[in-house]
């Protein structure tokens, strides 16, 4: 065999080996990733106590009072008006938030009255009696409490005011 035939045979063998390696390298590979999901029960909120400001006397002077009901059922007046708090039944609004322990949530709230005459109406920031606000404790139930406030002055119509505190709870 001459050198030329040897080189051609060697080149052919080399080319065949290269094509064979390329064919093997272009094959497919695969792997698997585990998948999981945790399905939770819906978060729930239930009212357990109404929001009751009790009775107040509007100021007779030209100044206003802010009526404040705190989360511990206490009504106070601030401002320079000469209004009064009358001894009467009062209560903060109470709600139970139910969800799996450790669930974090947020709330939105709105306080309104049907009758006109009260101004600067606002719910208080929610407080809790068990655990950190917005985190359901180990029991799976968190009580949240709301007070509220509004302004009155000598022009506020004397009447019974009715309304609602609407609270929405959302998973974080």
Give the role of each language-model region:
Residues 15-20:
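N-terminal signal peptide c-region/cleavage motif recognized by signal peptidases
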Residues 1-10:
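Bacterial N-terminal signal peptides that target proteins for export
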Residues 24-106, 134-172:
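N-terminal small/polar-rich segments of proteins
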Residues 107-131:
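Surface-exposed binding patches on compact interaction domains or structured appendages
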């Amino acid at each position: 065999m001459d050198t030329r035939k040897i080189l051609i045979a060697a080149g052919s063998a080399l080319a065949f080996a290269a094509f064979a390696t390329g064919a093997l390298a272009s094959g497919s590979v695969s792997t698997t990733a585990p998948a999981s999901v945790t399905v939770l029960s819906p978060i729930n909120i239930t009212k357990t106590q109404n929001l009751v400001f009790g009775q107040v006397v509007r100021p007779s002077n030209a100044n206003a009072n802010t009526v404040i009901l705190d989360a511990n059922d206490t009504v106070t007046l601030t401002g320079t008006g000469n209004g009064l708090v009358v001894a009467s039944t009062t209560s903060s609004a109470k709600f139970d938030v139910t969800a799996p322990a450790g669930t974090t949530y947020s709330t939105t709230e709105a306080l309104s009255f049907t009758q006109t005459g009260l101004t600067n109406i606002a719910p208080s920031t929610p407080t809790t009696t068990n655990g950190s606000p917005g985190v359901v404790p180990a029991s799976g139930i968190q009580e949240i409490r709301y007070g509220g406030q509004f302004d009155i002055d000598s022009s506020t119509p004397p009447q019974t005011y009715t309304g609602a505190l609407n609270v929405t709870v959302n998973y974080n």
